[in-house]
Amino acid sequence: MHTSSHRRFNPLTGEWVLVSPQRADRPWHGQVEKAPPENLPSYDPDCYLCPRNERAGGARNPDYSSTFVFDNDFSSLLPAENPTHAVDHPLLVPVYERGICRVVCFTPRHDLTLPELDQSTIESIICTWIDQTVELSAKDFVQYVQIFENKGALMGCSNPHPHSQIWGTQYLSNEPAKELEHQKAHFKQHGRALLTDYLNEE
């Protein structure tokens, strides 16, 4: 393995990334954030995502006992058509983006994160992700479904109750679009899947 500065090629994106292993020897090892509180309650009456509580948008959660899915009250994307106003400047071109943003509460428990759940509960969450992906993909304007989880305030998570988000978007996001194109090019050139080749190399 290289021990000095070098650029490494990312075959999924076609980009070169600077790698500087020698910087691991410097005395500063990065910002250290405080660990989240260890003794969270199983139910928090002030939590927007706990069962029976009122959400920030005014709706009240049901008394759910497994996963709970709802459209995000403060969605980054909206499903209604709302064409972008034309801008007569080549450097300021907007493109309207439709989408659906949903929240998936893993369980009613405020204090249990995904790795702390039992296998059957995790399987139930995965089945919910699959069902949501199928449902969103069936909408005529949805071209891409992304499932993700933000962990901690530093990553933009506004609520500690364990949950993920699912976005169904009208267009393929930049990173997945690049990855798709490079995987197509690899298959066309070699007749094999890029990720399978990478796994075999590992």
Q: What are these regions, as identified by a protein language model?
A:
Residues 1-202:
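HIT superfamily nucleotide-processing domains
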